[in-house]
Amino acid sequence: MQFHHVKSFSERAKPKDGFTLVEILVVIAVIGLLAAIAIPQFMSYHSEAIDAEMKSDLRNASIAIEAYYAKQSVLPASLAETTGFHPSGGVTVSLVIVSTNSYTLNAAKPGGTQPSFTYESITGSSH
């Protein structure tokens, strides 16, 4: 006569498939921590990129105006009279004639570190 040894429930080998709840919670906490660090940094980079876009448009507009002035000996009444300048998407560039040979440009776009930048042809600086 043969006897079969029956293992109790606690003695049976349990397959270890998947992750435990604690492991999943630790992974979620680590992902949350990384996101808390990365998202503000990304937003800062995004704002700085918008600033660079506005400053680039100011430089490009001033180059187009100077080219127009060199050819026509007069400043353009508007940026539409210049050739080759098209503002970046979402950037609004405006031209103000200060005198017969000086002007001010303003570039604005929401989302930058400041709402707009200004270029003055007299000083050659933007702020």
Task: Give short role names for the model-derived ranges.
Residues 12, 41-58:
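Aliphatic-rich helix starts adjacent to a transmembrane/signal segment
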Residues 1-19:
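N-terminal leader/signal peptides at the extreme start of proteins
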Residues 14-42:
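N-terminal single-pass transmembrane signal-anchor helix
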Residues 28, 55, 62:
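Conserved catalytic core of two-component sensor histidine kinases
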Residues 5, 63-127:
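Periplasmic/extracellular, small/polar-rich flexible segments of pilin-like filament-forming proteins
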Residues 36, 44-47, 63, 67-70:
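Regular, well-ordered alpha-helical segments
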Residues 23, 53, 66:
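Acidic-residue sensor for enzyme active/binding pockets
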